[in-house]
Every structure is written in C-alpha cells, then in structure tokens.
Amino acid sequence: MAVSAITGARLTLGMSLSSSTRSRTVAMAVSIDPKTDNKLTLTKSEEAFAAAKELMPGGVNSPVRAFKSVGGQPIVIDSVKGSRMWDIDGNEYIDYVGSWGPAIIGHADDQVLAALGETMKKGTSFGAPCLLENTLAELVIDAVPSIEMVRFVNSGTEACMGALRLARAYTGREKIIKFEGCYHGHADPFLVKAGSGVATLGLPDSPGVPKAATFETLTAPYNDTEAIEKLFEANKGEIAAVFLEPVVGNAGFIVPKPDFHSFLRKITKENNTLLVFDEVMTGFRLSYGGAQEYFGITPDITTLGKIIGGGLPVGAYGGRRDIMEKVAPAGPMYQAGTLSGNPLAMTAGIETLQRIKEPGTYEYLDKITGELVEGIIEAGKRAGHAICGGHIRGMFGFFFTEGPVYNFADAKKSDTAKFARFFWGMLAEGVYLAPSQFEAGFTSLAHTSDDIKKTIAAAEKVFREI
C-alpha cells in the first residue's frame, strides 16, 4: 500500500488489471432491477417509493437518495442503531453513510437520546436565547483553531451562505474562488461546477440559477496552484474569499497535495483575501479540531454542520472576532433564522462533542477505517479490478480507476457503471454504501472489527461476481 505525503492520509493506488472498456459518464443511467439483479426483498420499499414519487419531487427530499446514479429504486429506512440500519422490508445493513456524516458515535446513541428526552420536557423550540447555545458555542470555540466567535444556523448550506455574505461584507469585495467538484450547499453562487448531488446528476450547475448569481464565482481544479495564481493575477484586489473543502468529500474522497493548503493560506494573506474552510463534513471528523487542526492550517472563517448537531439539523460559521463582529446584531451584516440554536440540536451536539473528545476516539476511527479501505482495495485488485482509494481517520472513499485522483477531472475517470454493480452487490450482502461514486463514506465509534471483517468478506465476494 502506498502512503501519501500527508501524515495519516493513506492512499491505496490500484493498477489496472482489466482491459474491459469502462464508461466515463458521471451521471450514467444504470439499468438495474433489484427484483432480478439482487437477492434483496424490497417489496415494501418499492411500494413506499412509488407512493412518495406522487407526493414529493422524485420521491425524495434530497436528490442523491433517489439512487439515480446507481439505478434501481432506493431502500426506505425504518430504523437505525449503532452501526446498523433496517429497511421497511426488514433487511439489515452495516451502514457506511452515517446520515451523510453526522453519526460519528453511531446511530441512536442511548446517551444522546436520553439527553434529548430531558430537553424536550422543557420544550422543543424557544425562539429566544438558551443556555445550551452557550455550552455548544464554548465547545466549538475551544476545539476549532480558527473560531473565536460562532453563529449557529440550521444547515451546512446556511452556514456557507452566511460565510459568503460575511466574507464580502468584511472585505468589501464580491468575487470568490471555489474548486471544481467541491460542494458548499445549494445556494446559487456555489452551484458552479459543484459536487455532491450536482455531480451525481451530471449537471454543470442548476436550472433556475441566474447568470448574475454566479458571475462573481471563479473556479479552479482542486490541487492546482498554478490555476489559482492565474485567477489572482487576473482579478487583483477583487477576490473576497477562497472557499474549499479541506478534504473533498462531495466528489468522492480526494485529499489535498502536501503543500496545497499552505499555498492557499500564503496567497490569500498576500492578497488580503479570506480563506474559508468548509468543514461541514470534515469538522470534528478528521480530528477534534477538524481538518485545520489535522493539517495545521488556520483559515479566517470556518463552516460547520453534521457532527455538531449530533444528527439533528444544524450548521454554524465562525472565525476571528474582528470578522464575526460584522454579523448582526453586533454589526451590519444581516443573517437570521427562526430555529437557529434550537435546544434539541444544541443538546445533541453537546452530547456528541463531549463523547468524541474522549481519548482514543480518532485513533480508533483511523484503525478501523484503515483496515476497511485496505481490505476493499486489496480485494478489488485480487479480483482484477482497477481501483484506488484512501482514508483519513473516519472518512474514506474509493474509485474504480487506476488513480491517483487529485481533482474532479480525475474522479470522473471512475467506472461509474462498475460502481453501481458493486453498490448493489454490497447492498445484497448487507452493506450500505453511499449510492453515488461521488460521495465519501464514514465510519463511527459504533463500528466494530467484526463489522469491518464482514464488509471485506462481502467485498471479496462481490468483486468476484462483477
């Protein structure tokens, strides 16, 4: 196994062992019928999804859940606990999606549920300040190097919207730089060469986004320092902020090259531009202080979500005090939210952060995730597949391509049709992966060595079959 130059970021690079022609289409329509192509009984899920499509656009409330990029129809979940989930047909799965990242201590944790029960006795929403906001704010500020003040919101999208408005208000500039394949929520200015569901659907952006909304958004390939230099040269004194996922999770799992973050920190300082780390996914996931602590780079503004709400809707943005004091009511930059700082999300966040602060958390996540990724990659190579992948702590991913993968263009070389077959094969073996090649996976403290062994055994079987 190859080890990247980034400490702790293990990258396993598989060589091509197959001469078969592979599809390069990002949003390939894969024809799969779970009734014939899989061993699962999904009758109730099929009925529920058919009804859902008459009630909600596409039958879901977030596009990737519809299984568009893997074909077939989605499973409908009944319950979750620990590392497991059960669909309404009674099928059990080892879960590596973790509600797309929040479930770092496992699903439906007893301590979190008990704390939520006590909080609910006092009410579910106040629309006024509560002490729980102070407690979670103190935990976040103590943990994250860049954050001296924090504002809670209700989603990662809201957090990035707030950070964008704040960066523009603070600098008096309008242009921003984002990276191809990086996803910062569904706000108009960010839907330019975006990742996550946009990548899954194969859309370069989204209909309904006016040109004016994205006119000030500049893009560059991830890990491409030369492209960034050219953008700064061509837009001197105009760039308010550089936004990035410090580790990409919304175009698959892509790590930064060793000097990429330090380059961005240097060039932004030289140009009086703010550096914004979107740590909605990596915050409290790569270390207790997030990716910025892990890599030793301090941005000006950080966005958070997922883990800080312990599975409830939440988001946050924070940064240096002089920047954050621009936010109303301390300053002139307006942003508000009816349910921001609600007691339930604050409670779940407090319980979760206190748990993962305990010694050994990240060492354990690194150990089990490393075993998982190594096992899957080695099984794929033995079966003759081109595959590469890697992990940092409890975040991982793999691509059906020779690799290495340093940006979205590299990621799009992955054989998405093969991924779809692998996804359904693993699902039939009781393993739930993200239903898209272009999403990262997650482990939790609830995952056991036995879970990892079962998953690798399932992968070995599926790789032989596909």
UniProtKB/Swiss-Prot annotation:
Q: Which GO terms describe its molecular function?
A: glutamate-1-semialdehyde 2,1-aminomutase activity; pyridoxal phosphate binding; transaminase activity
Pathway given for this chain reads:
Porphyrin-containing compound metabolism; protoporphyrin-IX biosynthesis; 5-aminolevulinate from L-glutamyl-tRNA(Glu): step 2/2; Porphyrin-containing compound metabolism; chlorophyll biosynthesis
- Provide the tissue specificity: Strongly expressed in leaves of etiolated plantlets independently of light treatment and, to a much lesser extent, in leaves of mature plants.
**Does the entry feature the keyword S-adenosyl-L-methionine, yes or no?**
no
Q: Where are the transmembrane segments?
A: none
Q: Residues bearing N6-(pyridoxal phosphate)lysine?
A: 306
Span of chain positions assigned to the transit peptide in the UniProt entry:
1-28
Subcellular localization: Plastid, Chloroplast
Q: Which InterPro entries match?
A: 4pyrrol_synth_GluAld_NH2Trfase, Aminotrans_3, Aminotrans_3_PPA_site, PyrdxlP-dep_Trfase, PyrdxlP-dep_Trfase_major, PyrdxlP-dep_Trfase_small
Q: Which GO terms describe its biological process?
A: chlorophyll biosynthetic process; protoporphyrinogen IX biosynthetic process
Q: EC number(s) in its UniProt entry? A: 5.4.3.8
What the entry lists under SUPFAM superfamilies is as follows: PLP-dependent transferases
- Summarize the subunit comment: Homodimer.
Q: Which PANTHER family match?
A: GLUTAMATE-1-SEMIALDEHYDE 2,1-AMINOMUTASE, GLUTAMATE-1-SEMIALDEHYDE 2,1-AMINOMUTASE 1, CHLOROPLASTIC-RELATED
**HAMAP family cross-referenced by the UniProt entry:** HemL_aminotrans_3
Q: What is this protein called?
A: Glutamate-1-semialdehyde 2,1-aminomutase, chloroplastic
Give the organism's phylogenetic lineage: Eukaryota, Viridiplantae, Streptophyta, Embryophyta, Tracheophyta
Recorded name of the encoding gene: GSA1
